[in-house]
From Swiss-Prot:
Phylogenetic lineage: Bacteria, Pseudomonadati, Pseudomonadota, Gammaproteobacteria, Enterobacterales
Post-translational modification note: Predicted to be exported by the Tat system. The position of the signal peptide cleavage has not been experimentally proven.
Record organism: Yersinia pestis
Leader sequence residues: 1-45
Keywords attached to this entry: Heme, Iron, Lyase, Metal-binding, Oxidoreductase, Periplasm, Peroxidase, Signal
Membrane-spanning ranges: none
Residues that hold heme b according to the record: 247-249, 340, 345-347, 358
Pfam family, one: Dyp_perox_C
Physiological role: Involved in the recovery of exogenous heme iron. Extracts iron from heme while preserving the protoporphyrin ring intact.
Name this polypeptide is given: Deferrochelatase
Cofactor, free-text remark: Binds 1 heme b (iron(II)-protoporphyrin IX) group non-covalently per subunit.
Length: 434
């Protein structure tokens, strides 16, 4: 018998997806003042020559870098870095011209931050142009900043209604959700990842400093995976805070035809032309009832997931990446019918179209007001079709045994922009000039 006592969560509170006009005006006014201070300083520094020093025959991790330019943005197929932050913003821009300025500025800053360089110096009577938390040298540190846009950006403010991706929608409540209005939605979502927390925080502060009249933080959450998993560059599956491997069934990045089908919007998808090369991003903040879970017998934990806790192998099998054969277990005697892995991926020809690429991170925020540990999973996944992938899978998962131990409290649906071809282009250019 499972202990039914566990953390209590408040009811879902309906909220407006976009920031209210009055709040936007207030923040905009504040931003223009601070923006004047920033613009009074020196121009943006040019990226320095970031040659990799020879450190004991291996590259210093601080100098690791991911390409900024390309058909797709980095941070989707990139092997997971150790540190991550999700930051949702409300856009303060009031017209399309200002919105274009925002995305050009984001492109400029991200190109610099992901390359690295020397922090610029200014007159000491002016605010410094860099926070200084990384010292005088800004290392790339494997930084990626993946930019996505929310459903609300396609409202009447910028005249983009006709360019909205077909499947993009406001995240609605599932039966087990207890959504906090302050942790949902956003006009722009940044997924910031790097080797270290310092680099992630530095990137966020740089972006905020340079966009005071254009962006306002709506909510943020910081996540992590083990250093061992990060250094494996995708070879070792991260372990979540319930003690189980998370992401075992991901499609292999090396299988390019499969990845192109699962992750990226293609020319024949019926989407707006600008969206080709982008991806639908799902973000879910999922709180774990870890005290409750830690009192649950191991056998029950394993039947809930359908996997061995140590090896990650499907029950009745030996290795993590062994594929379960549900046809030989039609009554669920080995892997229960309501096991997480069986519901999420039934392994049929029909359900192959429901695949997605997961890129989740753990989070830990201290304790709740009731004295319970506030920790869980920052679930992030990418797919070429939101309805066919995440939404379909989540419908199958409704009512699963795992729901007793987890509670989604926030997040949103976003569209990850196509990549930037080169230094002559900018993020969202094909959308804004469509």
């Amino acid at each position: 018998m499972r202990d039914k006592t566990g953390p209590k969560f408040g009811p879902y509170q309906p909220d407006d997806e976009a920031v209210s006009p009055s709040r936007r005006r207030l923040i905009l006014g504040m931003g223009m003042v601070s923006g004047a201070l920033v613009l009074g300083g020196a121009k943006t520094a040019q990226a320095a020559d970031c040659r990799s020093p020879d450190v004991a025959g291996t590259q210093d991790e601080r100098w690791q870098k991911q390409p900024f330019y390309g058909q797709h943005q980095a941070g989707v197929l990139t092997p997971q870095q150790a540190a991550m932050m999700l930051v949702a913003f409300d856009v303060l821009a009031t017209d399309k011209t200002s919105l274009i300025r925002l995305f050009k500025l984001l492109t400029e800053r991200l190109a610099f931050l992901t390359t690295g360089g020397r922090a610029p110096s200014v007159n000491a009577k002016l605010p410094p142009l860099d926070s200084g938390i990384m010292g005088p040298e800004i290392y790339p540190d494997n930084l990626t900043v993946t930019v996505s846009v929310g459903n609300a950006l396609f409202d009447e403010r910028f005249g983009l209604q006709g360019q909205k991706p077909l499947r993009l929608q406001r995240m609605t409540r599932f039966p087990n959700d207890s959504l906090d209005a302050g942790l949902c939605h956003g006009d722009v979502m940044l997924q910031i990842c790097a080797n270290t927390n310092e680099t992630v925080i530095h990137a966020l502060r740089d972006i905020i400093k340079h966009t005071p009249d254009l962006l306002s933080v709506r909510w943020k959450r910081e996540g992590f995976i083990s250093a061992h998993a990060a250094r494996s560059k995708g070879q070792d599956t991260p372990i979540n805070l319930l003690g189980f491997k998370d992401g075992t069934a991901n499609p292999k990045i090396s299988n390019k035809p499969l990845i192109n089908n699962v992750v990226w919007v293609s020319n024949n998808a019926g989407e707006p032309a600008w969206a080709v090369g982008g991806s639908y991003q799902v973000v879910r903040i999922i709180r774990f009832k870890v005290e409750f879970w830690d009192r649950t017998p191991l056998q029950e934990q394993q039947t809930i997931f359908g996997r061995d806790k140590n090896s990650g192998a499907p029950l009745g099998m030996q290795h993590e990446h062994d594929e379960p054969n549900y046809a030989k277990d039609p009554e669920g005697k080995v892997i229960p019918m309501d096991a997480h892995i069986r519901l999420a991926n039934p392994r049929t020809i029909e359900t192959q179209r429901n695949l997605m690429l997961r890129r989740g991170y753990s989070y830990s925020l201290g304790v709740s007001n009731s004295g319970q540990l506030d920790m869980g999973l920052l679930f992030v996944c990418y797919q070429s079709d939101l309805a066919q992938a995440f939404l379909t899978v989540q419908e199958r998962l409704n009512g699963e045994a795992l729901e007793e131990y987890v509670k989604p409290i926030g997040g949103g649906y976003f569209f990850t922009l196509p990549g930037v071809a080169d230094a002559n282009h900018y993020l969202a250019q094909s959308l804004l000039e469509a």
